[in-house]
Amino acid sequence: MYNGLHVHYTSNLKGEFVMNKEIEKQLYVELSSLTKNKESWEENIDYVASLLENQSSKIVAKALWMLGEMGLKYPNKIENYVNKIASFLNSPYDLLRERSLNALGRIGRADFNLIKAYFGKIMDLSKDNCSNVRLSFIWASENIATNTPTAYREYISIFVELLDDEDNRVRMEAPEMFRVLGKRKPEYVKKYIEKLTYISEHDTERVVRIHSKGAIKAILSNI
């Protein structure tokens, strides 16, 4: 098992505890090494989860991402930490909301029941002020919908709105949710073929047009 570094904190002028930057760097390198060593994931879930209490948002973000990947592979071993992971959906830090969504999406792909209690809050973040969070919301939804598409039956309108998002990257990703659902539950999204067709012909971003065409193809191929 990986041995956590003995971390020292210092107090800044505001009385806040901050991590020594060199220690933070070493810990991040350690986590990056563990990320590549998938054979050690199962025995290190508890250790990585303990880092959710770390004072460094960079370390917490890395831990959240890793727990999502670990949870996809070992969902039965991540159950005790899902509540803590979901608590970051309310974080004041954009990055931590992103990573919480990413993690819950991967865990939910493996076992929807593990994240079901937090599904409503996940959906709320579709309207987050941060475009990166909205993007992560779509990614998480694609993961969950891969194996539990029925969870989205009453939420299609949310993704219709995201097709018109002001952020280019969000608009690029939004049609992908229609592609995922089109392969599994085309009846949920077939009524939006006309809108997707318009987007595929008129959106200013080439990737948006391509992804919209891909969504249309997926829907029509499975009706």
Model features per residue range: what roles?
Residues V7-H8, N12-Y74, K213, K217:
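N-terminal alpha-helical scaffold/docking segments in eukaryotic complex subunits
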Residues K21-K25, S57-K58, D94-L95, N129-N132, ...:
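Alpha-helix N-cap/helix-start positions at coil->helix boundaries
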Residues E24-L31, D46, A61-K62, R97-L101, ...:
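Alpha-solenoid HEAT/ARM repeat scaffold
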Residues S32, G68-E69, G105, E142-N143, ...:
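Structural signature of alpha-helical solenoid repeat scaffolds
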Residues E39-L51, P75-F88, F112-L125, P149-L162, ...:
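Amphipathic alpha-helical scaffolding segments comprising HEAT/armadillo-like alpha-solenoid repeats
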Residues G71-Y74, G108-D111, A145, F178, ...:
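Alpha-solenoid repeat junctions
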Residues I193-I223:
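Eukaryotic acidic, Ser/Thr-rich intrinsically disordered low-complexity regions
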